[in-house]
Every structure is written in structure tokens, then in C-alpha cells.
Amino acid sequence: MEEMDLNHPLKESIVFSHKMALLSKALWKSVEKDWQAWIKPFHLNLNEHHILWIAYQLNGATISDIASHGVMHVSTAFNFSKKLEARGLLSFSKKKDDKRNTYICLTDSGRQLFLETMRAFNEHTYHVYQGAVPMKELYGKFPEFSELICIVRHIYGTEFIEQFDACLTDFQNDVEEKDGHLKLASANLFPLQPAK
């Protein structure tokens, strides 16, 4: 990260940092509670569901990819991925042209469960979504979070934000909605062999 001139009044720095901490904590508490309630019927926790989502989006992610995209420690990504593998939801595989890295992909059961979780999403029980609806009604669109994205870009780097944007775009393109039902459109992008 580039060194910046942080010569700002201490009081301003503390107030900003505290405001960001409290707002982030309040939002996360709501997101976490709603996310847990959403996936509880599928016997998943947040890390497991997030890994399934990343595995779907990246379609052949390494543990490092999952840790990076999921903003989690490598050991957390590995341990929860192994639990999902034991449930038959993920497979560990190698690319034919890259035997060094192990890639994690959704199994058919994993893809099916992931789709079921998407179908079960209920915007009426997701408080952050409900909190943003008045802004959508007023401005015609949901908040785009440009200031927040700028802050995250300075913390995690441009590549993180580019991957984040690409995954959201891919997800929007890969999920089809018809008559209130979701369908995942994409298939594996490269041939895999079981990990040894």
C-alpha cells in the first residue's frame, strides 16, 4: 500500500475511525444475523456458504483464492473447504496443465445446494436490503457504495476490487430468473482431475 500523508487533526481521525467502526459493526451484525437465518435450513455456516459461493463464481479456485475473495485466513478457507468436501459439496482437483495447485470446485450436489440457497433468499427478511429499499424508491437505484469501495480499494488493492466487480458481474450474468425461480447457467470452464 502506498504511503500517504496522514497529517490530519487527531480529533477528526478518531471521530472518522470510530464512526466507521460503529457503522460497520452495526451493519455486519444485521448482515450476519440475516445470512445465518437464510442458510440455517441447509446446515451451513457463513464461511461454508461463502466458500460455496466463491467456488461457484471462480469455478476452480485455490485455497488462496478463497481466502483472498472471502477475506478469511488461509487455514479457515482450508478447514471449511475440507468440511464441505466431506459432505460431498466440493471436490479438490488438479488442472491437466497445472499439477502444482489444487483447485476447489462445486460438485453437482454442491451446485444444487448453492442454487437452493439462492432460491431460499427472501428479501423481506434481509434487514440491510429492507433498509436500502427507501433509497431505491427515492433515487431509482440501490446505493453503489462508491466511497466504501474507494476505502476498501486502498486497504486491499485494486485487484481485489476488480475481482469483486468481475464476480458480481459474472453472477448477474450466470443466474437467470424466470417466474420467481433462479437457474445457474454456467458450467465448468476447464477440465479437472481429482487431487492426489
Swiss-Prot record:
InterPro entries: HTH_MarR-typ, HTH_tscrpt_reg_Hpr, MarR/SlyA-like, Tscrpt_reg_MarR-type_CS, WH-like_DNA-bd_sf, WH_DNA-bd_sf. Residues 13-157 form the HTH marR-type domain. GO terms for molecular function: DNA binding; DNA-binding transcription factor activity. It comes from the Bacteria. Residues 63-86 bind DNA. The keyword Transcription regulation applies. GO terms for biological process: negative regulation of DNA-templated transcription; response to stress; sporulation resulting in formation of a cellular spore. HAMAP family: HTH_type_Hpr (MF_01911). Homodimer. Negative regulator of protease production and sporulation. This is HTH-type transcriptional regulator Hpr. The gene is hpr.
